[in-house]
Amino acid sequence: MIFSQSESTILTDKIRPNWTTSDSIIYLNIPDRPANALTGSAFVNQVKNLSIINREIAVVNEILSGNVPSFSRKLKAITINQSISGNSYTLIFYTLCDYMAIGSDQDYFYIPMTPSTAQFLADNLNCILPTKKMVDIIYNNAEFKLQPQPIPPSDTMTTVPVFWQHTGLVKQQFNQLGFDRSANNIVGGTKKDIIISNKIYSLDRNYERVVIYGWHLGVNNPIQPVYNGHIAMYADYSHGVRLISNLAFLNGDSVQVEDILTQQSLWILLSNEGIIPQPYYPDSNYLTSLDDHFENAPIDFQLRQNYPNPFNPTTTINYKLSKKALVELSVFNMLGQKLVTLVSGEQSAGNYDINWDAQSYASGIYIYKLKADHFEQSRKMILLR
């Protein structure tokens, strides 16, 4: 099954993925790899002397144009069974079989990225980045667990030649194992993950940062603990991007992974650091203009879960516009009566945070709705006094 254009463009309260719980493999909504696409080695030669910003723009262009190997477009189902407060839950989520790469199954290049670029791709492909707990779960479920291949630290570890060197070390292991890169198997041990974490926005750093974790030597034995000391523009050879479908199944019903991470009763399924109210990285200014080059990209607009949630009495609503649009953001009660319009007018492409002060309203469930051109999406929030 493949993510449909309509499904990933218009997300509503009731999410209807065009696959079922019986599908063990699904695919990213990107084009088939073009016949004339660059190989991994050719792409390395093209970007090795570029600035990091121009390199990341080139990376996004290649990936959204479909120039990725099969393991970077296939997502495999993982099932979690857990009891919470006496209730039994079965969650099925979908993870890329391996980290993002550019090229073919035979000639590919694992490409480290900054977190904003990884988030840009996730947003455009209806995906999310993993949490620490999800990284552990994915590794434990990996059919092939490779030995990490560290390269001695140096000033060149953030350069394309060292990225390419590390890709070669990983390929050697696959060749020695006789592993078929087109197989439907999850691979672990190849990279550290860029993860979603409360440490993205924590007060222990006064700068935007990337949070990394993983590179397991074995079960419960990662080389890299959770770390948020690197600036957001840092990416070295050991960093990898493994996308997770934002659409999943909980007890047979379709859900969003992002919503699970922000819900008081469910976060424990996928997080071991509590609720993650902002399960995403800040947008990158230098990538915003790229949306105009991908008119058929799956997501033009996105409404995220408010934070905090539950809240008392103020909360923040975040949404993303990939192009200029006439926008209306309103709050309704459960009877469908409009209580307040928070935004009304034309806005440029970008990421927006809108505060709502519910001081004059009673405790309860409220609905906030975003309209932007032909897009419309609603979410629920809880005022708890």
Language model region names:
Residues 1-9, 290, 320, 374:
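Bacterial Sec-dependent N-terminal signal peptides
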Residues 7-74, 228, 247, 258, ...:
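N-terminal module-boundary/linker segments of secreted carbohydrate-active enzymes
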Residues 80-112:
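Extracellular adhesion/carbohydrate-recognition regions
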Residues 109-113, 127, 215-287, 382:
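Disulfide-stabilized, aromatic/cysteine-rich ligand-recognition loop
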Residues 115-185, 243:
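Conserved hydrophobic ligand-interaction patch in extracellular adhesion modules
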Residues 170-238:
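Extracellular C-type lectin-like domains
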Residues 292-385:
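C-terminal outer-membrane/trafficking sorting elements
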